[in-house]
Regions:
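N-terminal helical cap/lid subdomain that shapes the substrate entry/recognition surface
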Residues: 3-103
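Structural signature of beta-strand start/N-cap positions in the alpha/beta core
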Residues: 6, 117-119
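Conserved phosphate-coupling serine/threonine residues in phosphotransfer and NTP-handling enzymes
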Residues: 122
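Catalytic-core regions built around general acid/base machinery
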Residues: 104-115
Length: 123
């Protein structure tokens, strides 16, 4: 039996991208009147409770972008941020599509890809 794996799978958030640093940098870049680290943490901390609402049937199956937006709206309220336009909220919500990789991610994945099939996933 060959014990060498053929496929390597990697979680996206926290493993191949720096979600926290990326969100905090965006919060700082757009000048939100909030601590960038606290805002990023609050936004991500809303994920499990929101998913629990989906799993329980309180919310129907929801696309992740819509779930992130639902959470964002709550975090903006929590931080008393009321000045953003709808377009600004949409752009901020899509920061999850612009997460930056860790410094060694690209080189590391390319090296692994030369010997294995690689895939990313996220729950």
């Amino acid at each position: 039996m060959n014990a060498t794996p053929k496929v390597l799978a990697f979680d996206v958030f926290g493993t191949v991208v720096d979600w926290h640093g990326s969100i905090a940098a965006e919060v700082k870049r757009i000048g939100l009147p909030a601590d960038p680290d606290a805002f990023a943490t609050a936004w991500r901390n809303g994920y499990r409770p929101a998913m629990a609402r989906v799993r329980s049937g309180e919310l129907p199956w929801t696309k992740i972008d819509d779930l992130h937006r639902l959470i964002l709206d709550g975090v903006l309220k929590e931080f008393d941020i009321t000045h953003l336009s709808e377009d600004q909220k949409k752009h901020l919500n899509l920061v999850w599509h612009r997460l930056l990789p860790w410094e060694d991610t690209i080189e590391g994945l390319l090296r692994l890809k030369s010997k294995f099939t690689i895939v990313t996933l996220s729950n």
